[in-house]
């Protein structure tokens, strides 16, 4: 491949996708956000993990082509005409290096179309993945997907504030929707998305990849089997140093695009993880936040935030996220019989869990042996396909995404006021774990 894409292509004009380049200008109109193209910034290494975990074939740590990490060979492909067709909306680093390669392990799904504000980039990606160039759309002609019966669903991988608009447009086009987390930047937008899905009689699934990760599911199974005993405490920590010089990260520092800082981006893993590990909803939250007033990265969004949640069972949780401390992804669940440790807890491929009992630690880690069928991205993509084919509910529906956004807003309120906030809203989880 000799084609090259500059990382500065039309940088000042638009935001093209999640983990892609963000506008350097204050002009944040919808046209500025979605109308222009952006370049391919060099992707960073995958989330760090222990050597006990093995990556799938072809999962190089650093992308080696302009279209991101190469897609590994699909060892058990189904006939293409029997697969569920996705249109990928947004071609940022996450789409290029995780989602698109993830289709190699899918048994029921295929890449049918691409949607991007950068035509040159889209053509390169389409060529590498065998997508018909006539199936390349941009943000202005996105609604034409309604005329393509081979597109069954769209996967929205755009900045948070654009999720609602493109989800609603997709439903109006008669397509199912998978949307990246957080679901939206407001509870009102979440409700609009849910209402649009119901009106179109289509499925809405939020891309909570850890719900489909073998290690996270194994952790839930251990807890549900009472291996830890009565649960008392959950602690989560998700942190990463925000590089404001990385064009792919700049939109995350703009409140109008991101809706918030580290909590909306990475803290949500701990928030959602606490809920699915405990299997219940918090009834009260408290929170504290801090951003260095001299750090220009955090003029609009928070850097560090910690929150505590109280549950009806008596369990308590402590969550933390940060944009200025070294990368961590760590969960701990304490019961009266044992402690479950997850470190890394929310990595892409190398999550590990262990159980420690009183008097000694059981250090026999349970590594995630990755096969394409167990890849969390492949499993997530196929889950929506199977739910549609079999007319079953999805594991991570829109209501689940809205609950997290509502809790995030409550956490921000608690941090702002310095008072506890009641969250006993009577929410009942749908879809199960």
Swiss-Prot record:
Q: In which pathway does it act?
A: Carbohydrate metabolism; D-sorbitol biosynthesis; D-sorbitol from D-fructose and D-glucose: step 1/1
The places in or outside the cell where this protein is found are:
Periplasm
Q: Which UniProt keywords apply?
A: NADP, Oxidoreductase, Periplasm, Signal
Catalysis: reaction(s): D-fructose + D-glucose = D-glucono-1,5-lactone + D-sorbitol
Q: How is it modified after translation?
A: Predicted to be exported by the Tat system. The position of the signal peptide cleavage has been experimentally proven.
The note describing how and how many cofactors are bound reads: Binds 1 NADP(+) per subunit. The NADP(+) cannot dissociate.
The record ties this protein, via Pfam families, to: GFO_IDH_MocA (PF01408), GFO_IDH_MocA_C (PF02894)
User: Please, one GO biological process term?
Assistant: sorbitol biosynthetic process
Q: Which cofactor does it need?
A: NADP(+)
Can you tell which superkingdom this protein's organism belongs to? Bacteria
Enzyme Commission number(s) from the entry: 1.1.99.28
Q: GO molecular function terms here?
A: glucose-fructose oxidoreductase activity; nucleotide binding
GO cellular component terms, A-Z: periplasmic space
Q: Write out the ranges of the annotated region (Disordered).
A: 1-24
Q: Where is the signal peptide?
A: 1-52
UniProt xrefs under SUPFAM superfamilies? Glyceraldehyde-3-phosphate dehydrogenase-like, C-terminal domain, NAD(P)-binding Rossmann-fold domains
Q: How does it assemble?
A: Homotetramer.
In the record, the note on similarity to other proteins reads:
Belongs to the Gfo/Idh/MocA family.
Name of the molecule in the record? Glucose--fructose oxidoreductase
